[in-house]
Design a protein with these regions (language model features):
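Extended, highly charged
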Residues: 1-280
Length: 280
């Protein structure tokens, strides 16, 4: 379906729409269970765009990499090449390319603010104990700054600009423990609106392969990944991201007896959603 990797979510969404692979949900849906219930009818295997979620102006897209065929196509390869392509990217990484301006800097919002004033935070199951952010890519750096960690984390929304963060990575747990010993928070960024290839790059093991995940991601996409420096933390994030939350992670404030670290955002950076090239 593609002649090369797609790095921009809006372009990929339009490509799926042009190929009649995108399902449009035009009626208003609720962020309380309903959106996820509709998506689950397809098993997450069908690209979907929800045009009216509660009263938010921005649409919500799901399922862009829900099958091996979709994932491979977004990177310009065949599904049968996925393993070989990933192995080659791990062994032949491409260092990211730093840019000074990016779409995710079109609109900058500083605390105090509430995340759910700008985009929906979903309740996924009826019996969930709250609303969760689940599709954001966490970005952090090793203590010496030599490696970038990226991963998909589930975050329980606490209201305003606070959320919990579940960390299962051994290296990051150890890093958090060192920050706790020195009473210093760990700088992080949470990134939304990424193409499937970037998400795939976040899933390899940094510990096993001793790799910088953003460099592996560049190899997956066939060219160095454009990254832009954050405004309030010393990190770089994908320049084509739709939403970037910058913040700091605090250990030792678990909530509801769940082993989660506490995360407090300091700045939310959002693009101009109204100028996005989504199908009408």
């Amino acid at each position: 379906m593609t002649n090369g990797a797609i790095t921009d979510l809006k372009k990929l969404t339009k490509l799926y729409d042009d190929a009649h692979l995108l399902s449009h949900v035009s009626r208003k849906v609720s962020s309380e269970n309903e959106l996820m219930a509709v998506m689950k009818k397809t098993g997450g295997k069908r690209p979907m765009i929800f045009h009216h979620v509660d009263d938010y102006a921005a649409p919500v897209v799901t399922g862009l990499g829900g099958t091996r065929d979709l994932l491979a196509s977004s990177m310009g390869i065949r599904a049968g090449m996925l393993r070989q392509h990933l192995a080659h990217a791990i062994t032949h990484p491409l260092a990211p390319h730093v840019v000074t301006q990016a779409p995710c800097q079109q609109r900058c919002i500083t605390a105090p603010f509430s995340l759910d004033s700008y985009f929906p935070v979903l309740r996924h199951y009826e019996k969930d104990n709250g609303r969760f952010l689940i599709s954001g890519m966490l970005t952090a750096k090793s203590d010496d700054g030599s490696k970038t960690y990226t991963s998909i984390r589930r975050m329980w929304y606490m209201g305003a600009n606070k959320t919990t963060l579940l960390i299962t990575s051994r290296e990051m747990q150890q890093q958090l423990a060192r920050h706790e010993q020195t009473h210093t928070p760990m700088e992080i960024a949470l990134v939304f609106g990424l193409v499937p290839g970037v998400v795939l790059g976040s899933q390899i093991s940094t510990h096993l392969y001793n790799a910088d995940k953003l460099a592996v991601t560049g190899a997956l996409l066939g060219k160095p990944l454009d990254v832009v420096p954050c405004k309030t933390v010393k990190l770089e994030v994908p320049a084509d991201a739709q939403v970037v939350l910058e913040g700091k992670c605090f250990r030792g404030s678990n909530r509801r007896k769940v082993p989660l670290a506490r995360w407090r955002t300091t700045t939310a950076r959002l693009p101009s959603f109204r100028s996005a090239n989504f199908p009408a």
